[in-house]
Amino acid sequence: MNFTLLFSVFVTISLVSIIFSVSMSLYLDIYDSDWYGLLSKNNTNVYSQEKIFLLGSSTVYSVNSTLVNYHFITNEMNYEFFNLADMSDSPKKRILSLQNIISNEPKIVVYGLDIGNFRIETQDPLSLNDILLHPKNFFLYQFEDIMQPIRDKIPGSPKDRTLLTAKYFLFGPQPHHHPFLNFYETSVTPISEIKNNNQFDIEIQKLDLSENSKQVTSLKNIITEFKKNNIKLILFTAPKLIQEVSDDDKQLFEQTLMYYSNEYDIPVYFLHDRYVDMEIWRDSQHVAINSNTQVYTDDILEILLMEMK
C-alpha cells in the first residue's frame, strides 16, 4: 500500500469517525427525562416525581428500571428511576454530559464505577531508529494515537446510536426509563463455560489511582458538581465475574473509594465481587437480564431505600 492511498484511508476513517462520535455524543448532551417525542401522545410527565438517575457503563445496564419503579408505585413513593447506563462509560466520558444531567434536576444519582476504567493506558513510544527505518510504523502509531479518543466516545454500533438519536426526537427515549442501551432479555451462561472461554484471554492490568489520573480527576469533579447542586450521590462498584486486576490493586481501589467517601461525605457500596459465585451471568462482564437474575436490581433498590431514609 503506497503512502498516498494510506493517507487517504486515514483521512476518510478519521472524518467518518469524528462525525459518528459527534452524533453519538449529541444524544447524551440533549437527553431530557421529561421528553416524550414530537410524535408521541404523551407530551409531558403528568406526575412531579423526584428523579433518581443510575449512571455507569454496560456493567450496570441490567439493573431493571421497571422493577424499581414498580416498587415505588406500589409503595406510594414519590420517585421515578432512570437507568442511564451507556456503553463504554467512564468518569472521563460522563463528565462531558454532566451539566445536562444536572439540568434534569435529579434528586439522587447512583453511580456504578467499573474498576477497569481506572487502568493505566500504555502505549510504548517508537524510538528514533524505528521512525527512521520504518516510517510507515510511525504513521500507523500516530493514527492509533488519534483514533483511540474517538473509539472511547463511540459506544458500540454507530448505526444503532444514530437510529436511537432519530427515534429520540420522534418518540422520546425508548424505553423511557432505560434510554441509552437496548434493554432486552438475555440468557444465563454457566460460570464454568465463561471461565473456560476466557482462561487464555485474561490480562492483568495495573490501575492508576493517582491524583494525576484523568479518570480520578473527572470522578472528583463529578462528586464536587453534584454536591454543589445539592444532588445526593451514591457510589457503588459495578460487578464483574472476572476482574482483570490484581488483588492488591483491587484492595487499593476499595481504599481509594473509602477515602473519597470520608472526604466528601458520600456513601460507597462494594458490589464488584458480590455475585462471583452466582449463576446469573451473561458473560464475564455483564449480569444477564431475566426473571432469575434480579438480585442485582434488588441490591440497588435496597441501597436506595437505605439511603432515602
Predicted regions and their residues:
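Short hydrophobic segments within beta-strands
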Residues: 54-55, 112, 236
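Membrane-embedded segments
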Residues: 59-145
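Residue-level recognition of beta-strand->loop/alpha-helix junctions
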Residues: 83-85, 237, 270-272
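Active-site segments of SGNH/GDSL-like serine hydrolases
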Residues: 220-247
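C-terminal regions of proteins
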Residues: 248-309
